[in-house]
Amino acid sequence: MTNLPSHHTAIVGSEDGSLKVAEQVPLPRLENDMILVRNTAVALNPIDGKMVGNLASVGAVAGMDYVGTVVGIGPKVKTASEIQLGDRVCGAVQGMHSLTPSVGAFAQFVGATDIVTLKVPPSMTVEDAATLGSGVGTIGLALFRSLDVPGYPEAPATERIPVLVYGGSTATGTLAIQLLKLSGLIPITTCSPHNFDLVKSFGAEAVFDYRRPETPDEIRKFTRNSLKYVLDCISEPETMQFCYKCIGRTGGKYTALEPFPQFLHTRPTIQPDWVLGPTLLGKPIGWGPPFERVGDPDVREFAIKWFATAQRLLDQGKLQTHPVKLMEGGFEGILCGLEMLKKKQVSGQKLVYMIPQVA
């Protein structure tokens, strides 16, 4: 690790709880399990725009998903695929975090944790690779630990049963559909009609318009009132209510990607849960309630196994990335893109921004 600057440009939390572009931000210090990456591009996630106000940490770097080139490797790094200086890698980091304020994706350099870092296949573009990190981790955690669906991409289920993905046209939704298909299950989903062809192209076997009031009845009919597994990729109060209506008579499991109001848990035969991607690191999470966590070594062990599987799926060309909308504007453009996500102006695409390089 030579000829690197001591400071770089990044998007950080400001005193008023908003995000701002800052220069002269210290580079992440290379930890034992860290890979230092010269950032090439980032993808935006809805959570990136929510890490403001009380969740913002002054001076902490924001952003989760990145892709770039390895410029430093910690002495105890272990990854699913051997990584060397100069390799292209992608993944997700825990941005806007008071315990690790120098780590975030919206920056010229990223300090990535080894076990959740993926080596980018030679045939994959940087724009596509930028979209993978948080989705791969979060959806793996949701499907194969929280829901614990029968089947796994490398050990498909012997019985093809339906699994509902609410919000199938999101980046997490299209990834979930593919992984369910690879696991020998029947992915069914909801989205807007203009995205029906999109989700079918990723493997959805049945698609329903979430806006129609009769859709829960149609899903119960399609699943013969026996649906047991639901992943809610939108995770809002009304979507939880919708999903509960779809689950079969004997109950099942519901997993969201954000916290849900407990009063909406209206069916005792349903086991509700929500997942938080950064728990995969097995380290303490210093965000405020309800996101704070102590490090869980069991989740870390799951992450090691899961990212090894994900790396093999990538290398074999079995994972298709979400459609990308390549945006302009660098760091200032990222701030505009976060506003677009907040206003729900993005559908069926992932916003990706190239990162300005160090002069």
Curated annotation (Swiss-Prot):
Q: Where does substrate bind?
A: 134-141, 277-281
Entry keyword set: NADP, Nucleotide-binding, Oxidoreductase
Give the metabolic or biological pathway: Secondary metabolite biosynthesis
Coiled-coil annotated spans: none
What drives induction of this protein's expression?
Expression is positively regulated by the fusarielin biosynthesis cluster-specific transcription factor FSL7, probably via its binding at the 5'-CGGNNNCCG-3' motif present in the promoter of all the cluster genes.
Q: How does it assemble?
A: Monomer.
Protein name as it appears in the record: Trans-enoyl reductase FSL5
Q: Which gene encodes it?
A: FSL5
